[in-house]
A protein has these predicted regions:
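A composition-driven signal for long, intrinsically disordered, charge-rich low-complexity tracts
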Residues: 5, 61, 148-150
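Generic beta-sheet signal
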Residues: 40, 64, 121-123
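N-terminal phosphate-binding or glycine-rich loops at protein starts, especially the Walker A/P-loop
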Residues: 25-60, 67-68
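Conserved N-proximal alpha/beta basic substrate-recognition cap immediately N-terminal to
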Residues: 48, 56, 69-179
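A generic structural motif
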Residues: 60-64, 93-94
């Protein structure tokens, strides 16, 4: 008979397995080789923080692509659509392109990722990205360059043992007390 403790896989073993399947830096470096670095675009999940990302992207001179869920797209496709002068200067707005999909998770479709790569999209992972798509899919299947560390996204999850509070604790930095 197998004892329950023996049947359980250690957390360290689970972490090792996860790292073996996670897209590696070399995988993304290979993808970036095909990018036209003069035509980079900023992409993001079109949720509450997307306008902040778009505003920053436009301010830094990057075209923006908001990946929207059908029925929640008008804010990005209509109200904040970028209007540019004939020289390309932004007159108003901050969303150059709104891609409307049935579900936010459709960014995980291979065909959608191919289109993102053709557009030279660098994806900014906001909280909604890892809420609507599983963290495992983001780590293992999202073959689009991300701004930031793919390895650190798991720490944003509130259910992880080693979450952002754990990092703050280890760094001996203060944070609000849980109520």
């Amino acid at each position: 008979m197998i004892e329950p403790a023996q049947a359980m896989v250690s957390k360290t073993e689970v972490d090792k397995r996860r790292l073996r399947t996670m897209l590696q830096r070399d995988d993304i470096a290979q993808i970036i080789e095909d990018y036209d670095r003069m035509k980079l675009r900023i992409g993001m999940t079109a949720s509450h923080s997307a306008l902040d990302i778009c505003d920053g992207g436009i301010e830094e001179g990057f075209p923006t692509v908001a990946y929207c869920q059908e029925g929640r797209h008008k804010t990005y496709a209509n109200y904040f659509k970028t209007k540019r002068s004939s020289s390309g200067r932004v007159l108003r707005g901050m969303v150059d392109k709104a891609i409307v999909m049935p579900s936010f998770n459709d960014v995980m479709n291979d065909s959608m990722q191919v289109e993102m790569r053709k557009r030279n999209v660098v994806y900014i992972p906001n909280r909604s990205f890892t809420s609507y798509s599983s963290i495992e899919d983001v780590e293992n299947k999202f073959r689009v360059p991300l701004f930031g560390s793919r390895n650190m996204l798991r720490m944003e999850e509130r259910t992880e043992e080693q979450d952002y509070y754990w990092i703050l604790d280890k760094a001996r930095l203060s944070y609000p007390e849980a109520i």
